């Protein structure tokens, strides 16, 4: 049946397979330089060299019974001989847990491996070049196709033919697996551990387990590794999240309405696709069918409630679980990276939907640098590893993954542990290698928001200055919620990179700044590094009991182009912070506020009364070139990345908001710089 199904897919779905290749990105590797020098060339030669085994065998829909009786379905990919028979030798085994269905993985694998087709598509993608045009973002996305990320999303046939087994499993409640989709909760996490243990005990496994996968399949790697199953010896999470509420569900306390509806629709839609072969044979799994009927639209109720409940008193207990930090749901979503002992190669992007967590995860893992690696690209969620494998870039992501597994699952001394350990695309500069993040030598410094014009923009609500010392005199500036943020880097980030094809939105913030107050520094005279988290401290006044603030940190070029380096947002009434988890600089200023984000700690605003709050911006890594300026923009909305929960939106009345610039209670940005900006 396995080979028959393989023939069915290869004969009837080539068009879908080719389409799948266009929807996934890529990522890459590491050493003492970003391209890893001679070692990188060796890793690439190994990955692209002759296969140890000529074929690949697939066992379809293998049942794995969980401890509570629910049956998960897995495809098992094994090395095969020239006749297609699986090789009897036990191999290290790679486990991938996916909610996007192993059928999608199989189609993507067919696209990557189809003779003639995949090479043609990759060559076509390399030839697409919109650089220097207003649509250069198209090239940024298409260059991901040749970077190796697709093979980390799906099944890497070449990895298997080199002597690995891969197990791709539909997580509970998705694909052909029974049960109710748990969205990372404890039962789903237990399933991952039990699947790892099951794989380690099979005759085709030598008991040494690794994990691979992108996004959802990266998050469950972090969760599994934190539980330290004995068999799990290496992970390669590509674009993982950590604290999902703060990352994407409710950044700054506002609903992430740009990403969540489409993502939930995709997973819930895919999970309803039945096993067509079983259906045609009259033996469709009735338990699977009952489970899908019982819960066809998992988690949509939270989103609907968040945007429809009219007032705080009407919030139902179900939604309150998302708003209480000690709820079982919120606790299950915390990463506990500090408990990881398996060697970890982590890829993230400075504009990924999970950027907030990626450097935090790396720093929290208690392993020596080298045994843990961080690669951060100038990328969105859809294009991990864009350009990898090109001169000056890290090696392709599949190359890096192969080297990582060879080192930690096969004990091959290939030098991968000498890479990095932090390989970062420094915005405004390019690919760099450093020994830590944030970089050594930076210091958080105040720069004050001042009303005096900088003369650098005529399109923002107010053109102010960014100064090294407090301004004289008190000024109140007003900014109203608007929709110009629909064309912004934050919108591109929230939409996983789809909007990044338009440079005027993703690479220049001046359209979004039409609804913002801007504060711009003098030009820097020497290269100036920015590395780490950023905090914007605001002295605010509202006419209502709630509001929403967003801030960006921008690199302003001599021609006026304003490129967002990082951003953050905050619901005014949810400004309370957890001091034990927040970070401050030596003078007591917050550098990285950690919000409690709970209804119990909500602090409604007293209209007309000045209220200070801190807008934390995600960590960044950048270099201001001589002649460039630093800018902070402040706005009263950030749709679609974040929107006030409906009860709080009603309280805000979408009224204009006021920023007070008062030397006695100044507004300022606390930014990590290696040298002061005058």
Predicted regions: what they are:
Residues 99-161, 226-339:
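Accessory cap/linker subdomain of secreted extracellular hydrolases
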Residues 32-122, 153-155, 459-505, 676-678:
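Catalytic-loop region of hydrolases
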């Amino acid at each position: 049946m396995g080979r028959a199904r393989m023939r069915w897919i290869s004969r009837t779905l080539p068009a879908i397979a080719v389409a799948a290749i266009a929807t996934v990105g890529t990522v890459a590797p590491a050493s003492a330089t970003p391209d890893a020098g001679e070692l990188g060339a060796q890793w690439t030669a190994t990955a692209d060299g002759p296969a140890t085994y000529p074929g690949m065998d697939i066992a379809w829909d293998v049942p794995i019974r969980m401890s509570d009786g629910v049956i998960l379905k897995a495809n098992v990919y094994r090395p095969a001989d020239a006749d297609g028979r699986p090789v009897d030798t036990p191999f290290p085994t790679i486990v991938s847990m996916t909610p996007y269905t192993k059928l999608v993985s199989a189609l993507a694998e067919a696209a990557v491996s189809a003779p003639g087709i995949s090479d043609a598509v990759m060559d076509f993608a390399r030839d697409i070049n919109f650089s220097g045009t207003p649509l250069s973002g198209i090239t940024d996305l298409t260059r991901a196709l040749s970077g190796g990320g697709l093979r980390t999303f799906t099944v890497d046939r070449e990895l298997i033919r080199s002597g690995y087994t891969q197990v791709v499993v539909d997580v509970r409640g998705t694909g052909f697996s029974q049960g109710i989709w748990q969205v990372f909760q404890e039962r789903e996490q237990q399933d991952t551990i039990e699947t790892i243990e099951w794989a380690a005990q099979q005759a085709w496994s030598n008991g040494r387990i690794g994990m691979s996968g992108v996004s959802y399949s990266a998050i469950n790697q972090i969760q599994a590794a934190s539980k330290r199953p004995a068999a799990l010896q290496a992970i390669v999470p590509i674009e993982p999240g950590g604290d999902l509420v703060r990352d994407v569900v409710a950044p700054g306390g506002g609903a992430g309405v740009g990403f969540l509806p489409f993502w939930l629709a995709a997973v819930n839609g895919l999970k309803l696709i039945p096993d067509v072969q079983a259906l045609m044979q009259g033996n469709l799994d009735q338990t699977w069918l009952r489970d899908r009927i019982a819960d066809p639209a998992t988690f949509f109720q939270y989103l609907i409630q968040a945007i429809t409940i009219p007032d705080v008193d009407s919030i139902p207990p179900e939604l309150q679980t998302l708003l209480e930090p000690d709820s079982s749901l919120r606790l299950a979503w915390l990463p506990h990276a500090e408990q990881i002992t398996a060697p970890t190669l982590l890829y993230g992007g400075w504009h990924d939907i999970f950027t907030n967590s990626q450097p935090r995860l790396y720093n929290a893992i208690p392993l020596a640098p080298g045994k843990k690696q961080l690669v951060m690209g100038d990328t969105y969620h859809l294009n991990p590893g864009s350009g990898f494998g090109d001169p000056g870039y890290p090696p392709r992501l599949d190359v890096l993954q192969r080297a990582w597994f060879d080192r930690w699952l096969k004990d091959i001394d290939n030098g991968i542990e000498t890479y990095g350990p932090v390989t970062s695309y420094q915005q405004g500069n390019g690919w760099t290698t450093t020994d830590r993040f944030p970089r050594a030598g930076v210091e958080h410094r105040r720069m004050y928001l001042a009303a005096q014009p900088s003369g650098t923009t005529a399109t923002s609500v107010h053109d102010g200055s960014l100064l090294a010392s407090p301004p004289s005199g008190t000024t109140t500036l007003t900014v109203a919620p608007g929709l110009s943020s629909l064309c912004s880097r934050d919108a591109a980030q929230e939409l996983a990179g789809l909007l990044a094809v338009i440079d005027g939105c993703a690479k220049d913030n001046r359209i979004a700044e039409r609804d913002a107050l801007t504060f711009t520094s003098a030009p820097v005279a020497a290269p100036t590094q920015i590395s780490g988290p950023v905090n914007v401290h605001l002295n605010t006044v509202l006419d209502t009991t709630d509001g929403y603030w967003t801030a960006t940190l921008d690199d302003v070029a001599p021609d006026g182009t304003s490129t967002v380096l990082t951003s953050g947002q905050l619901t005014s009434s949810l400004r309370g912070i957890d001091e034990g988890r927040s970070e401050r600089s030596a003078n007591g200023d917050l550098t990285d506020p950690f919000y409690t984000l709970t209804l119990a700690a909500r602090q409604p605003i007293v209209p007309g009364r000045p209220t200070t709050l801190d807008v934390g911006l995600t960590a960044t890594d950048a270099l201001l070139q001589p002649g460039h300026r630093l800018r902070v923009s402040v706005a009263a909305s950030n749709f679609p990345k974040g929107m006030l929960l409906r009860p709080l939106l009603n309280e805000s009345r979408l009224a204009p908001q006021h920023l007070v610039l008062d030397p006695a209670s100044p507004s300022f940005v606390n930014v990590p710089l290696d040298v002061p900006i005058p």
